[in-house]
Every structure is written in structure tokens, then in C-alpha cells.
Design a protein with these regions (language model features):
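N-terminal cationic and glycine-rich segments that engage phosphates or anionic surfaces
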Residues: 1-113, 118-122, 127-136, 182, ...
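Positively charged, low-complexity, intrinsically disordered RNA-binding extensions
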Residues: 136-243
């Protein structure tokens, strides 16, 4: 198995603090997708995938519709996607993805989280190179398949790693990781080849050796991550600490 499998194995049970956080995160992504590609799911594959993701998280239909409507509401400020890079205590690199309608607020908040933890917010590019941007899909099918043959076929579509895992209902799903730019190509293949798209997202995988921390040192980083993730503007947090 590759690094995507190991990374996911460590993180798959690490969820946002509660359901409302999940809905807020997906809702912002839906709004941004509508802004970029329009509200018609037929011509907006990213929106189509996000709606499937929302359904897999049991996000109410009203929440999905509100997120779509927000994108077309001229009275609502646009969300801006921003990335923050820095170092937490013990030399751990931290990359934060946010979606905000008030950049000044978000910058001030994120900087304070780093400072209070004994870390520091860095400049653009200071830790970004330690993480590779990827797309991730979860799909399933009732039909028989051969995972090795599937992997060989999907390599031509930008898939770099494929493996199986069980979801919370103990149903088998196929997980795909691919090149960041291959999102639409992979999604199209899934939709055209009889597989059910369960969820899809963009993510980052560390490309450096992860640092092992224990005891109080590990707790320091976990506290920083928790503080950052509690911010409503924050979408994702990645670090170079071994989970």
C-alpha cells in the first residue's frame, strides 16, 4: 500500500468535532463550486460530487439548497479560499486551508493560534512544498470487480493509488487517490462506468518523513490543531506530525 493508504488509515476516524462543523465545511465548498461553475449540476461536475458528499454525510437537503442559493445572493459576501503556512511547536510544519468572507479576521485569528502555541505563521511557500495536492474519491458497486485490473485501467485517468475500506455501515467502498488536476477526468470515469460516487474531495498528502512526537510534545500539537479546527473559517489542517 502507498502513502495515501497509510495517511488515510491514521486519519479516517478523525472527524470534525460535531455534525454542524461538517455541514458548514461542505456548505462553503458547495457555495464556492456554484460561484465557479454555476448552479446546474449537469454542467458542474465539482458541484455534482459535492452534493454526493453532502448526502453521504446526511446533510439535510435544506442546507444544500441554502449553500447553493448563497452563491447567487448579491447581498452575501463571497468566500475567498486562502492558505496559511507556519510552524507549530517542536518544529512541526502546519498548513491551514480556509474559506472566509473576512480575510482580515481570519488572518488575525490564525496568527493568534500559532503565536499562543509557541509557533509562528510563515510566509507563502514556507511549508507548502512539504504537501502534495491530491483528489480523493470514494465509490462503490454491487457488481464484481478485480482491484488490480481496476488500478491498471485507472492509471491512464490520473489515479495513483487505489484500495478498499469499510464505511461506518461495514459496507465495502473503493478509495481512489489521484493527481489534483485529474479530478474531473476521474469523476467522469466513475459516473460513466456504473460505479456509485459516494464522496469526493481535494486533500493534501505530506511528502516528507513525518515527525514522531510523544507525551506533552504531541499534546501541544494536538491542542494547536484543535484550536485551529474550531475556527468556523477553517476547512482543513495538515501537519508533518506522525498521527
Amino acid at each position: 500500500m502507498g502513502r495515501a493508504f497509510e495517511f488515510r488509515k491514521e486519519r479516517k476516524f478523525k472527524r470534525w468535532g460535531h455534525m454542524a462543523r461538517v455541514f458548514t465545511k461542505i456548505g462553503k465548498e458547495i457555495t464556492i463550486a456554484v460561484k465557479q461553475g454555476g448552479p446546474d449540476v449537469t454542467g458542474n461536475p465539482r458541484l455534482r460530487a459535492l452534493i454526493q458528499t453532502a448526502r453521504s454525510e446526511n446533510m439535510p437537503k435544506d442546507n444544500i439548497e441554502r449553500a447553493i442559493k448563497r452563491a447567487t445572493d448579491k447581498d452575501q459576501a463571497d468566500y475567498k479560499e486562502v492558505v496559511f503556512e507556519g510552524y507549530g511547536p517542536h518544529g512541526i510544519a502546519v498548513l491551514v486551508e480556509a474559506a472566509t468572507d473576512n480575510n482580515n479576521r481570519t488572518v488575525a485569528n490564525v496568527r493568534s493560534y500559532f503565536t499562543k502555541s509557541g509557533g509562528s505563521l510563515g510566509t507563502s511557500g514556507s511549508v507548502d512544498y512539504m504537501f502534495d495536492r491530491k483528489c480523493m474519491f470514494r465509490m462503490k458497486t454491487a457488481n464484481p470487480y478485480d482491484l488490480e485490473e481496476l488500478e491498471l485501467e485507472l492509471i491512464d485517468y490520473g489515479v495513483e493509488e487505489i484500495f478498499e475500506e469499510e464505511n461506518e455501515n461495514e459496507e465495502k467502498e473503493i478509495v481512489l487517490y489521484g493527481e489534483f488536476t485529474a479530478f474531473n477526468t476521474i469523476q467522469k470515469w466513475i459516473e460513466e462506468n456504473g460505479y456509485e460516487l459516494v464522496a469526493a474531495e481535494f486533500t493534501r498528502l505530506p511528502n516528507v518523513d513525518l515527525k514522531v512526537l510523544e507525551g506533552d510534545a504531541k499534546a501541544d500539537i494536538e491542542k494547536l490543531i484543535e484550536r485551529i479546527e474550531e475556527d468556523d473559517d477553517v476547512q482543513n489542517v495538515y501537519t508533518t506530525m506522525q498521527p
